[in-house]
From Swiss-Prot:
The keyword Nucleotide-binding does not apply. Residues 1-76, 126-150 are extracellular. GO terms for biological process: endocytosis. GO terms for cellular component: membrane. It is a multi-pass membrane protein. It is found in: Membrane. This is Protein SLM6. The keyword Amino-acid biosynthesis does not apply. Signal peptide: none annotated. Present with 339 molecules/cell in log phase SD medium. It comes from Saccharomyces cerevisiae (strain ATCC 204508 / S288c). Disruption phenotype: Synthetic lethal with MSS4.
Length: 150
């Protein structure tokens, strides 16, 4: 069944019987939940400044990306860092156009969360396609890539 998918990333995301693929998905979900919790906790404190709240979400997302760092794919770490810094710059620019500091902090936190999560998805898909030569194309669809090994 898995051999029908031409894209390696689709193969690894859709073939749930593979333990390496399911391990990668669970790592991604853990990372997203950690980033979301940090965004919510920083937006609850509405008295704080927008820059501090966004910075807290940014550094929390860095600490939640240990799986990408452990995978050995350096461009993915570089891309995540660039996208997080870009999200921080964009979100803080909204602070100057918003009169409500509470709403601005809430919006900024979830903007950083969205950028970080989309960066994770893009990195997982790109790295899986790059390592397509390392994927065995047997009947069981074994996506044995180093990316999804914990």
């Amino acid at each position: 069944m898995c051999s029908r998918f031409s894209s390696t990333s689709l193969k690894c995301l859709l073939c749930s019987q593979n333990r390496h693929c399911s391990s990668g998905i669970s790592t991604l979900l853990r990372s997203f939940s950690c980033i979301t919790l940090s965004a919510i906790s920083s937006s609850v404190n509405c008295s704080g400044s927008s820059f501090l709240g966004s910075s807290f979400s940014l550094f929390s997302s860095f600490s939640c990306k240990e799986s990408l760092l452990r995978s050995g794919v350096f461009p993915s770490w570089l891309f995540c860092m660039f996208s997080s810094i870009l999200a921080l710059a964009i979100s803080n620019s909204f602070f100057f156009f918003s009169s409500n500091a509470c709403f601005s902090l809430l919006f900024n936190s979830f903007l950083v969360t969205g950028f970080s999560f989309s960066a994770d998805l893009l990195v997982l898909a790109a790295a899986a396609d790059t390592l397509e030569s390392n994927v065995s194309n047997d009947i069981g669809g074994n996506c044995a890539t180093r990316l999804f090994k914990l």
